[in-house]
């Protein structure tokens, strides 16, 4: 749908997304990345020496899209909060080498690690221990303190002004209005020197 509407700006709202599956994040990245990046490494997982292989790469695989489309974006606007974590942060980190990722909102959690599900029906337990660290294609995984907006004008605490705590999609809602201002140029970061 988005490709048929010739979407060239995209706001991804991850403020309440505390993670999920690597495969879902990989698909999302493939749909949003510039088409020139398709087929390239998106990142890799690094496991300890008890896991073989220790390095497991993942790519911007256009085969994942199926009947969908790649939007071929150059810039992605991501709405974040203190609840944005894990796979959501992976999307930010792994797309950064290929496009401009503009963060709007609050500082994210800083969970640059992944877990695996281990179940034992006999013992009636399920565990999800941390088993790997997540890197982007440039070998970066340095977001233990979370991602934060690069420009103070993009720092938005949606709870600080309840009159702007509005339904999703309302253009007066605090984070969305800031993103729209970044897109239309009414809110600009200071000039780079």
Go through the PLM ranges and name each one.
Residues 2-9, 17-193:
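C-terminal "post-core" interaction segments
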């Amino acid at each position: 749908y988005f490709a048929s509407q010739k979407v060239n700006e995209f706001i991804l709202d991850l403020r309440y997304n505390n993670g999920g599956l690597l495969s879902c994040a990989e698909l999302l990245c493939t749909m949003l990345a510039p088409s020139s990046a398709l087929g390239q490494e998106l990142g890799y997982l690094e496991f300890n020496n008890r896991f073989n292989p220790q390095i497991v790469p993942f790519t911007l695989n256009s085969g994942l899209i199926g009947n969908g489309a790649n939007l071929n974006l150059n810039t992605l606007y991501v709405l974040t909060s203190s609840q944005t974590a894990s796979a959501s942060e992976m999307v930010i980190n792994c797309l950064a080498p290929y496009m401009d990722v503009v963060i709007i909102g609050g500082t994210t959690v800083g969970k640059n690690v992944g877990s695996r599900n281990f179940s034992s029906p006999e013992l009636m337990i399920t565990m999800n221990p941390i088993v790997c660290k997540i890197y982007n294609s440039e070998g970066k995984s340095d977001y233990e303190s979370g991602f934060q907006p690069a420009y103070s004008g993009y720092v938005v605490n949606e709870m600080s002004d309840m009159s702007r705590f509005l339904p999703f999609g309302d253009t007066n809602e605090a984070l969305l209005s800031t993103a729209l201002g970044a897109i239309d140029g009414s809110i600009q970061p200071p000039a780079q020197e």
